[in-house]
Amino acid sequence: MSATTKGGQEPVAPTNIRKRRGVQAEGDTESSTAQDGIGHAPTAQYEQSEDQEQAKLRQANKSYGRTPDGTVFTVPTTHDMVSQLLDPRQPKNLSDVIVLAILGMHILAAYALPSHLKRPVFAAIFIFWRASYNIGIGILLRVQSQHKLLVVKAKKWGIFEDPASGKNPRPWLYHLLKRELEAKIPEDYKLEEAPIEYNTWLLFRRVVDLILMCDFVSYCLFAAVCGSTPDGEAPWATVARWVMGWVLVGLNLWIKLDAHRVVKDFAWYWGDFFYLIDQELTFDGVFELAPHPMYSIGYIGYYGISMMAASYDVLFISIIAHLAQLIFLVVVENPHIEKTYNPPPPRSAGQMQPLDGAKDADSATRDSPATVHNMLGFKNIDLFRVPDYTTILLCIYLGVLSLATPKTEFWQAAFIVHAVLCRLWFSLGLGWILTFQSKEKRFTRHFVKYGESAGEAWRQWKGLYHVSTVMCHGSFIAACWKMYTVPADWTQEWSILKHVTGTGLVALQIWTAVSIYDELGEFGWFFGDFFFNNRTKLTYRSIYRFLNNPERVMGSLGLYGAALITWSRAIFVLALISHLLTLAFISYVEKPHMQKIYGQSIREEAGLTKFVKRSLPPPVKEWSDSVDKVLDEAKAFVEDFVESARPKLAAGVSTIVRDTTALFNTYPARLTISQLNPSLAGLDPKQYSLSLEGTVAQKAASGRSTGKESIHGRFPKDVKTLVLEYGAPIRVKWTAPANHSKNDWVGLYMVIDNRSREVTEVPSQGRWVPTCPGVYDRATDGGIITADKPLPSQPDMVQGEMVFEGDRLWWTQGTFELRYHHDGSHNVMSVSEPFEIKIGRFDEDLDEEVLATGGGVYERAVESELLPLVRNCLDRDPEIAPSTVDEPFGSPVERDSKYAKRVVYAIHHMFGIEFAPAVVPADGNVRKLAWRICNAKQVLAPYSMSKSRGTTTPLGEKFLETL
């Protein structure tokens, strides 16, 4: 599912539509009642009033959909796929018969196949249907989300067009679809009246029904053919296994039903990929229990079925299917949810971006930009930074020591003691520092006493905490390695199950740590509000929407997972000690500071707690309240006792720090050679032409003569190569015969990429625009300005205009060309003149005289050069690109790193200064970025890429005089 909507809320639909339909319904009721009630006025009046109330109630319960073009329509009531297929009261159609027949063939195969073929065959069948779900449906939804491709294809093929209009080439298909779809929705639906987006979604639903039902049935059949009772299993173990399995299956069924109650068919079948319902996004019921419950806890039934089947084959295929579903969530659904329900906010012109506490921490002055050199994550490792260098050396030390020493009792005890000491320092030592930092800023005062700033104290603390975290978890892993022994027989003592369960717990802790870091950032991860007064308010998003302190339990699951894998008492005791210290740290370090800083804004109960309490029966609620009261009194007594004794207890957060990053797969250009299309016969390439225009680079067209050529080679050439600005839009005009193919397209390529001028050998990688709209998807039509305009001088010729901008450009320097292709192929009809895209070097010859006048003048000069460059890098989009040096960048700059990478690339080639992409969203406007450039050039003056102005080598007689 991609979203959740509150079914009980009244939809925000246009009032006139609702009023008009309500009046019409009331009028119909009145007329019918009047006809039936002649001579029975009181009864007729009563029935009329009752019918009116029912009509109003039905009208109020209706939902209204809205298509991308703004069309509002009534969303008919639909039913879930199980009811549609198996409920005899629901109308049936041909597609139901087909689905039931395919399911019957699956069941028949489970009985008919030989025993030795059942497992591999049904494993292959389930993998096929699971791939159809995660890959097939995933591709369809992704192209629909990005390009509305399913709707575009439905329009292009005319499958929902009335044959009477003459636009439908397949009348039989239209009548079949009309009969099939209207049979399922007897009320409020007519195929010819519904928007094409809704009709396309209904057709998509039928495909989804087939895949989901076959996926579930094939999985159950695979579990059935693999099920068995282990040899020597005790009766109590068999009963416990089946009871626990059915409990998990029942819980899974309840999760699915409650989720469907909340989201209805609209979100269950990814309706918001096609249209939107005028209702608010909400989270209710099971959606308060866990993040993405349909894909997280919604698959626990798989493990219940695996438990009842007592088969590792079923368990492993369940894990693979669950992982595939999570990948589907990350790749397909999450990007669409972010785009649809969390779009970037509009940029307020002229409003400066405030710096948060983390940025204030690293800012030396009011005007200086914030540092963006993050500490966590493999991508942020920097060997020039002392904490990173230290952690790598310590990890090498631990690894070498673990591998070089034998697994004797002495060394095992030594590694356990070492892990305990590291945990005690991480918990008690760092907890003591944070406690006094919260009360009297002792850590910061120490650095201020020696003339350092609060920012320096913050940086030193981050390094200390980072090294301590790595040592704490590294020593624990080393101790586990010393205590671990590879099982001699994996089939004995539940060895496989212990390893699988332990690995799952470790993965869950890693996911928890990543979720916490993604939500808190570096400032929250390193307890930044202990050092600075953070002006932001508490927000409960991501994992914090369900849990107030996720590290309390989930942050230590990996420790117990390691204890399961090693099956060692010492590791279990070490995990228990670590968990207890984590709980103490939360209670005596974090919680008092949170109450001191945020006060009443702290939430008392998380979403999971509220959900569990609401689900309890009244007697259990009363008992729970009494237990909570006793625990609160006992807690108050313990706190008073501890405060009176004044021991400072501290503990550390026991979480594994691993910053996972998105993997960007870079595919190499695949060479393709296309054969000449027979449709080229009779076409004259001379009738095709391309011309272009764009913003000419003023400083890039410098002479290429270096003085090393011959006399003839030093003269400038007569023909000047067109040189365009980096990132500026390129307007292209084309001409072609009037009978040219509507599938023609123009692509942008580097000159060196293609050896042939007749056939293009490399893919365009998205840098192309069709000549005519409506042929390809909607996204590609965005580059079309005009199409097929007749030439007044040549009636048999047409012309058009298009623009290459944004992602259709090459964001690098080089020599490029445009190619006109025929009929959707790679056959070239025309090639434009080559042109260059260059970034002009900043005119640094004026540095000395400008700096003599004042550094502010030099900074203004940098700003004036930087502003148009940044505007080009931000696609000249008024919602993103600034119009002045003080105007902040749009929020997409922070969301999509491509903009920042463009800017730092351009700065590197214009000013000779190399920045990390993260500095662009951190600075937030051109003025701060210019300040950073000026400051960097001043610091790196002897090492910059600028021309040297130092003392030159003496020449001639002056050199001889110096000898």
From Swiss-Prot:
PROSITE patterns to which the protein is assigned, alphabetical: SAM_CHO2
Ranges per topology, Cytoplasmic: 118-120, 228-234, 306-311, 407-413, 482-495, 591-963
Catalysed reactions, semicolon-separated: a 1,2-diacyl-sn-glycero-3-phosphoethanolamine + S-adenosyl-L-methionine = a 1,2-diacyl-sn-glycero-3-phospho-N-methylethanolamine + S-adenosyl-L-homocysteine + H(+)
TM ranges: 97-117, 121-141, 207-227, 235-255, 285-305, 312-332, 386-406, 414-434, 464-481, 496-516, 570-590
Cellular compartments annotated: Endoplasmic reticulum membrane
Lumenal topological domain: 1-96, 142-206, 256-284, 333-385, 435-463, 517-569
Molecular function GO terms recorded: phosphatidylethanolamine N-methyltransferase activity
One GO biological process term: methylation
Family membership noted in the UniProt record: Belongs to the class VI-like SAM-binding methyltransferase superfamily. CHO2 family.
Protein name, UniProt field: Phosphatidylethanolamine N-methyltransferase
Gene (name only): CHO2
